[in-house]
Amino acid sequence: DFLFCLKAHRSLSHEIGKDWGESAERFSSAAQVLSGKRQLAAILIQLPFRFSYTAENRVYLGDLISALDGFPLVVEFRNEFWYQQRVFDELAKRKVCLAIIDRPELPGLPPESQVLTSDRVYYRLHGRNSTQWWNGDATSRYDYEYSPEELKDRARMLAAISRKAKQVLVAFNNHADAKAVKNARSLEGYIREFQL
């Protein structure tokens, strides 16, 4: 019962070119291998802060979701302007999960919303390193270790939200110095302790 969560290739999220359709086809073919074996839990489309809420980006995202239709999709927005009811409604209509993200509280970043747009919850913990978020590199930005109190709070939140979902997926992205592994083990322990 081992499941995989894939992250969409950066050619579909961070470095979108005119040939993105070909990239989507290649990615879809690769993902189909896991999907066909019922080992694909989700495909994360993580969109960067600069992917702002514009008409062009809305059309692109709709086209990308259509290109990956049939897969269990999760969208993670890093820009607060995507957090509005019309976006939630469209994701729900297409059965696309809106990722719940834990991140530093900084201007421009989305709120930690617990809006469910599908029967799946995808909770991604990036750490709360506010001093490195905008100026750090891919390692220092996520260099953060959650405290036991923070993880207990997350476990309680997951318990509450899991009552509304068929599947709950949790991913730690605070990967510097293996903090993600340590925090994931701790969270698992709290979930068991609280009998969630």
Model-assigned labels for residue ranges:
Residues 1-196:
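Residues lining hydrophobic/aromatic ligand-binding pockets adjacent to catalytic sites
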